[in-house]
Curated annotation (Swiss-Prot):
GO terms for molecular function: protein-lysine N-methyltransferase activity. S-adenosyl-L-methionine binds at residues 161, 182, 204, 247. It comes from Alkaliphilus oremlandii (strain OhILAs). One of its GO terms (cellular component) is cytoplasm. The gene is prmA. This is Ribosomal protein L11 methyltransferase.
Amino acid sequence: MKWIEVTIRTTTEAVEAVANVLYDAGVSGVAIEDPNDIVFVNNDEKTWDYVDEALIDFEQGALVKGYLPESSDLVEKIEIIKNSIAALPEFGLNIGAGEVSTLEVNEEDWSTSWKQYYKPTKIGNKIVIKPTWEEYIAQEGDMVIEMDPGMAFGTGTHETTMMCVEQLEKYISKDTTVFDIGTGSGILAIVGAKLGAKKAIGVDFDPVAVTVANENVRANKVENIVEIKQGNLMDVVSEKADVVVANIIAEVIVILSEDIKSFLNKNGIFISSGIILDKIDTVKESLVKNGLEVIHVETMGEWAAIVSKVKGA
């Protein structure tokens, strides 16, 4: 079967919005190639060997690729994509070049092409994210996590995930309960379990995410610790956690902040990321307004993570 690869050159800031445009157009899978995902290479020479050099050679900007089957309405879909991309700046997004190009490919070419950019990556002090299909010889102190995110979910190498992992390393102990909101591939819930949490719950609306996350939970043999649930945190979880982590987007974190306090134990920690730099103050103000105290702000590339706790705890 013939497919059309639609490639959009954009910015790190606009990657998620561009991917959503492609999904709305009916693409079968999205691949993201962003040189900013390897910004950590410059700061930690030990991780250099884990990075595919093809990413480092990219021209400035991120590439978002989606795949459409050849069909009678293909031209119309491409036009819709172009118009939708051109409209994104109206929402305050810097889309960079915003160039849209197409290429005819065979199904077998695109279904696994994204894997070539996903290599074992060390995050924080001890976590190593290893694709299930890659070989990796663990070093002393490494905590290896096996991941197969599928095409639709994060690999763990994005700045937002990296910052969340680094903060989880600080706050997880053997008696910790962790909630991971918008779990996707399940990576942060699994990290929590590997770091010693007694219980971790990952929540996601997407049934595909729930399936992928459960597969990764089994691959890491943490089924006795990690539970993946489909739905809204408020609807499917009735307990409280010591640590809640949400790697989503600023707008959703603002909404979550209205209720998150009721899901945190005394001295509970809320780790939020997926926040672009110019949204930091908006998120901080919402957290404080809803009874949380901001205790740390971390930035990496164009992204931020904010750590807060119940005020007065």
